């Protein structure tokens, strides 16, 4: 601890000598707060496979113009080793300092003689992935902290195929970043100068319309029954997906009512506890609006437009679905559509993460397609799609339990815009068949099995929290529960040692005959996450298995 304290105070002094303006004032206010100085300076904000993610503020362990500039200089050095004249697209969401950080990154890249395409307005993450592919750039950056609380921001890097950087590339970029001093090594030129010299070009409406044209063509090709369309209430949760979600739903002929209070950018997310469509609280105003207009479907996207949550009006009561349930319905719906209109072929495939429901496996088997699995994180799904793109195997659908979905070939990251359209089209087809989504899901369970899932997270902040998370993971590896309920432990999979073709990762999977229990530290938050996956013969049995797994988790975290 003494070495950590010494390092933190040495770096604090270095920052005091070099920063100015508001950040200098913020530093001076910390001078008597040892705990805060240690938390802000005990390490560098890590550039992991999620890029940078952290609280906004001064410090080496915070998101600010210095950490952004250093990361971007490292990224520039990496790119210039790959290619002589690289180019990069940069997008940003509605969070505090997102535009500032995007401009900082663009000025650093421009100073390194890298051509930058910078969005002239907020843009969702899937549009960034699309733009990288459309403009054939060598990479992309999006400034976002997704659905984290308002005090956070982040910085994600994309490779030339529009996929978020997987560990191989992230590690190479990290190696370049770690060579750099925060204050001496980052090149930068003024924004206006870079615009004048055409090192920075601004992207405007055309790329939005190109995206809408692309996904509209795909969606109309599904030839879904849309005789009856639900009235839709939509909230972007103050985020960047508003223009594209309303744009595609309008093109498809849906009547959409907005939650006006949440439709203008607000970096404080004022009416929300957290801007996360996985949370019931995020739907409070949307459900109020839905009752007023008698909406059949309620949609919410997160601030960077890559995740979506839904509610359905079921006999006058609004009920929600998990990310797994929506993924199962969309999988079955799309497979039906592909079989109906374009004949499925051997080798066609669905992609999901290891922590996502196994219910799609019997569905895929019936349709004669393959289920490919990846580690947690949509970047691995994007990587898998890219791997098979020239193999003759057709990508049908990819999803993860955390409310992220992708269909079509336009992007390589989860896309709440195309998902919003697909969910609305699927709901329309069900209505045209005199069915609700709830009834559709019930039919699927009766046919394919009563699978159940639950995510349980524990938050442990700061240095002490990181140590606690390490102890919990060690316990899962070395001393896991030998029984859950009446079921013996069959197998322990430690992905850190390397499992099959999966890259090494700090993930442990415990397999029991009807239960899977998977633990991993979050890559973007100070949390450890446990995923319970069960396969019951009835709904009641599935719920009982989940309860027994929860008891086992309580035992594991008690270290």
Where are the regions that the model predicts?
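N-terminal small/polar loop signature for handling phosphorylated ligands or for N-terminal nucleophile
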Residues: 89-152, 250-251, 255-310
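An N-terminal, well-structured beta->alpha segment
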Residues: 3-105, 112, 194-230, 240
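Conserved phosphate/anionic-ligand binding catalytic regions in large, soluble enzymes, centered on
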Residues: 41-61, 145-146, 232, 236-244, ...
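Active-site phosphate-binding/coordination module
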Residues: 127-185, 303, 314
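Gly/Ser/Thr-enriched, mixed-charge loops and adjacent short helices
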Residues: 14-15, 19, 36-45, 155-282, ...
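Phosphate-binding and adjacent anionic-ligand microenvironments
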Residues: 291, 296-297, 337-520, 527-531, ...
